[in-house]
Amino acid sequence: MLTEIDSILFPDNCEVVEMPLHNQWVYLIQKNGSSSLRNLQKTHGLTLLANDHLQQLDFVDVYIRDAKDRYVSGVNTYLQHLKRDHPELDQNTAFWFAKQYKFLNKHYLPQFHWLLNLSRYLSPHAKIRIRDFRDFNLIATDHNNRAGILPSDAEFAKKLLDNNAGLELWLFMDQILLDLAGEEMTWTEIINHYCTVHTATFDIVCQHIKVISKSVLP
């Protein structure tokens, strides 16, 4: 790992739950229904695979959420968790750090980064079946359970999104994934899509990916 935060954002823990009624193996991504899937897994005794066991899978289903909505929701969740667990912290300072340093927590880490971490454990030939999160309620009906988290309001979203340098690039990275909903691609094919179809825009990002890959990927 490059730094201590890499072990938080790219943990050695990737989990996939089987949804046999839907012929899906769904990757657990925070703020993309992971709590609902964990509840279903525990309630119904569904199969849960992690890490090296993912090598046996021919495909994994990944639900991609609207990037801006997920970012706002994720930061909101992160800050409320901080307030709950560390009430001594100043909330304005916590907000500043969350906005200034972009991605300090997995709740709002770009979905592209979640796939990057998943790729460490998948077979090179495994297909990633990209799905629109708007269809998530077809496999889990309780995903609106907020687990005690109060929803953000328009003022919070505006304060978070305004003058947030560099954020749009990463939101666009996730939007490209969402635009691929319905496709089945290997990780290599996804990377090639980024680095060929969007060459000019993502030249810097592709170089960044290579640096991460050397330090994070096997």
PLM features: what roles do these ranges have?
Residues 1-67:
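PAPS-dependent sulfotransferase catalytic core
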Residues 13-17, 47-64, 68-216:
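PAPS-dependent sulfotransferase catalytic domain
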